[in-house]
Design a protein with these regions (language model features):
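Active-site acidic/histidine proton-transfer and metal-coordination neighborhood
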Residues: 1-77
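Histidine-acidic metal/acid-base catalytic patches
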Residues: 27, 31-32, 39, 58-164
């Protein structure tokens, strides 16, 4: 089962740090935030965004994992974004042994274009299944006036996630 949100405004904001910013401040901030979230039975999801979104901090999945490891909080996990992985040409193998650090999976495309059927989706599904992932999988896509595009994306992701 899952929840479908239609017509929501984007909730993801890329990070753009000023030149020379003290990144260690982020560690303490995210640690406090993550620990608080965990104490309340939830998590904060760190989603990397590639530079195509005008970001310069946490631009790939590996740097997000590095930050999550440094923050070291059960309430600060990865929001895995397939659009980022596709844009950066990242390999699903990078996730091996770290699926427990994923709080949420976005099936998406670079630029939030309509979802395309891709081999990376079945590779990810196999890894998530193997490592016992049991959390949310959702579609992240830009606005469309063509309901058929949305229906196709939902049917595709349902096939993908029902097999987990």
């Amino acid at each position: 089962q899952g929840v479908v949100w239609v017509g929501c405004l984007p909730k993801t904001a890329g990070l753009r740090l000023p030149e020379g910013a003290n990144k260690s401040i982020a560690l303490a901030f995210f640690k406090e935030l993550g620990d608080y979230a965990y104490s309340r039975g939830t998590v904060i999801g760190m989603e990397p965004n590639p530079p195509i979104y005008n970001t310069n901090y946490i631009n790939d999945t590996e740097s997000a994992f590095d930050l999550i490891k440094k923050v070291d909080s059960k309430g600060f996990l990865l929001n895995l974004d397939l659009g980022t992985m596709i844009q950066n040409e990242e390999d699903v193998g990078e996730l091996t042994g770290r699926v427990s650090l994923i709080s949420h999976v976005h099936i998406s495309e670079p630029g939030l274009k309509p979802i395309e059927e891709r081999a990376i989706h079945s590779e990810l599904k196999d890894l998530l299944k193997k490592e016992g992932y049991d959390r949310f999988i959702s579609i992240e896509m830009g606005k469309t006036n063509d309901i058929g595009i949305l229906e196709n994306a939902m049917a595709y992701v349902r096939r993908f996630s029902d097999d987990l």
